[in-house]
Amino acid sequence: MTASAKAVQESQASRHQQEEAYPRAPYAWYVVGVLTFVYVFSFIDRQILNLLVRPIQRDLGISDTLMGLLSGLAFAVFYTFFGIPLGRLADSKSRRGIIAVGFAFWSLFTAGCGLAKNFIQLLLMRMGVGIGEAALSPAAYSLITDYFPPKRRATAISIYSMGIYIGSGLALIIGGLVARFATAQEAWNLPIVGETRPWQVVFFIVGMPGVLLALLMYTVREPIRRGVRSVKATDGKPAVEQTPMREVIAYLKANWMTFLCHNVGFALLSFSSYGASAWIPTMFVRRYGWTEAAIGQAYGLIVAIASTLGVVAGGRLADWMTERGSRDATLRVGLMASVMWFPFGMAYPLMSEASWAIALLIPAAFLASAPFGVAPAAIQQMMPNPMRGQASAIYLFVVNLIGLGLGPLVVAMTTDFVFKDKQMVHYSLLIVGTLAHLVSTALLWVGIKPFLKSLDRLKEWTVNQA
């Protein structure tokens, strides 16, 4: 076959790909359901540590700052750095396979946390959890984008993002129920493992099911990749040519202002949210004298219900605005939610009564979650298909390094080194959350105009590739 004939064949394949209808809605929503289920498990495994602070500190002699390191930076560094090569892999290889292997991997390391006998061992296991979970979201965002047309993507991605809050809420509820058990019981002698504390058993229980449940990903079909530049027939199956890294870097440079405002703006909202979710349970234990079980159930319900409704509402609002001609709806929804958070997010740490703090946490949680379905949807909206996995991985790199990596740690360090009083954790939450939202609001506002220019640039890129 001549080079010109080959080029024509590839061009025809690409056009056919663009014209083919999206998969049927019932199956597309089934795929979102499976991905959300996997995401729920990832957040249960990620967040369960936050409800076991007291027994872990008791048995391993770990300070608040080191607990902040375990719940945040130790996980986030590996999650973020491995996300970029795994996101690049998701742009050309089997996305369902990447997710399935990652699911089994992080589940094994979650269970491995139950084998930890000291801080270093627990640190290493948390790093492994981070590596495994890095496989999930870049591939999931890419799959969802190829299953849904643009006017439905923000809702679909927001429903997937519900997994954050359902998983976190379940982790709090389940963790709260087992925290009393984990705190009170003596060590057990288990076969093979030896002396085991009840909090270690909790890690076994939440980690091991995922090893088998990873097989569920093989009920998901790989959809046709839309907007790819080159599709070659290999044994009757489509294959995707990976976009050279230099082209990806060049495209990102051309849109640098959009990425700066978007990624850092949403990362600071994540910084506030992760800091709050890590230390709100401890705040209620120290400030109001609640048990871990009581706050786990109360805050877990808030996260599972209010935060889940918030992220879906954000996506639905963005799609509603998009259908009515708002091209920047995904960014504007994040901006609006950030502004509306202030009266509630600044008030709940100052309440002298626990009941008032709980009441204010409901709208604060709703508004804090609303941006996190539209944020990844904005990335899919502005990036060419062959670069979406990598752009999503970079977004997750920034959001999780700043948010998950530093949020819990900065709250803990503010308590340990600024106030030097464990009872002042509520003031740490107030200061960290308020400053993060102020800077985020400014960045998202500034980023709207560059975002619109990026959408125009994508149209030009698509025309040039036709």
Which stretches of residues belong to each language-model region?
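Extracytoplasmic gate region of multi-pass secondary transporters
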Residues: L49-N50, N255-V311, S369-F372, P376, ...
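Conserved MFS/SLC helix-loop-helix module at the cytosolic interface between two early adjacent transmembrane helices
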Residues: F81-F119
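Juxtamembrane intracellular "pre-TM" segments in multi-pass secondary transporters
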Residues: H16-R24, P223-C261, R287
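Structural signature of the two symmetry-related core transmembrane helices
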Residues: G97-A111, D328-G345
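Central cavity-lining transmembrane alpha-helices of secondary-active solute carriers
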Residues: G72-L86, L301-G314
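Helix-loop-helix hairpin linking two adjacent transmembrane segments in secondary transporters
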Residues: Y160, I164-E222
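Extracellular/periplasmic helix-loop-helix junction of adjacent transmembrane segments
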Residues: L52-F81
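Helix-breaking motifs and short loop linkers at transmembrane-helix boundaries and internal kinks
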Residues: G61, S94, L115-Q121, P149, ...
